[in-house]
Amino acid sequence: MSSDVSPPPLLSAEAAAQLATAPPVFTTEQILEILPHRYPFLLVDRVVEYQPGQRAVGLKNVTFNEPFFQGHFPNRPIMPGVLIVEAMAQIGGIVLTKLPDVAGRLALFAGIDGVRFRRPVLPGDQLLLSADLLTIRQRRIGKMFCRAQVGGQLVTEGELMFSLVD
């Protein structure tokens, strides 16, 4: 399966605000049924847009009580970039849930390409996470374009690769 999906344009602050208040497509409870991650590593609170096998958009409410803020950094809390990338990968895992070739398989992080960090994520921010499937090859390896935004501003974007295992 392959797709020639082009990443969508960056959402405006107004569009991001509309999605932030949209009813969930998947609640936290449903996300727990889809993803293997658990607290404190589950980084998607709800899914607000879902096109099976193509695209997903979700939210992560970043609070001061996040465990990573204790050490990153004690007097200036900033969400670690690697966890922003992990949150994007998790929303990418949700994109794959309804693909027939993927049922019962686990998507593992296989690489990142061209990921750039544009602004810090702070306590009180709401991350809007999106993932668009670009390709799946030989039903084993694939690539997604992922993006994180806060209030219509780009935080992080890039391509994430995954490997499917039984």
UniProtKB/Swiss-Prot annotation:
Recite the UniProt keywords alphabetically: Cytoplasm, Lipid A biosynthesis, Lipid biosynthesis, Lipid metabolism, Lyase
Question: Where does it live in the cell?
Answer: Cytoplasm
Which residues act catalytically here? H72
Among the GO molecular function terms of this UniProt record, one is: (3R)-hydroxyacyl-[acyl-carrier-protein] dehydratase activity
| Superkingdom of origin | Bacteria
Pfam assignment, any one = FabA
GO cellular component, alphabetical, reads: cytoplasm; membrane
Which biological process terms from the Gene Ontology are attached to this UniProt entry?
fatty acid biosynthetic process; lipid A biosynthetic process
**EC number of the protein:** 4.2.1.59
Major subcellular site = cytoplasm
Catalyzed chemical reaction(s): a (3R)-hydroxyacyl-[ACP] = a (2E)-enoyl-[ACP] + H2O
InterPro entries of this UniProt entry? FabA_FabZ, FabZ, HotDog_dom_sf
Where do the coiled-coil regions begin and end?
none
What family does the entry list?
Answer: Belongs to the thioester dehydratase family. FabZ subfamily.
Q: What job does this protein perform?
A: Involved in unsaturated fatty acids biosynthesis. Catalyzes the dehydration of short chain beta-hydroxyacyl-ACPs and long chain saturated and unsaturated beta-hydroxyacyl-ACPs.
Stored NCBIfam families? fabZ (TIGR01750), PRK00006.1 (NF000582)
Query: Per its record, how is this protein called by name?
Result: 3-hydroxyacyl-[acyl-carrier-protein] dehydratase FabZ
Organism per entry: Synechococcus sp. (strain JA-2-3B'a(2-13))
The record lists the lineage as: Bacteria, Bacillati, Cyanobacteriota, Cyanophyceae, Synechococcales
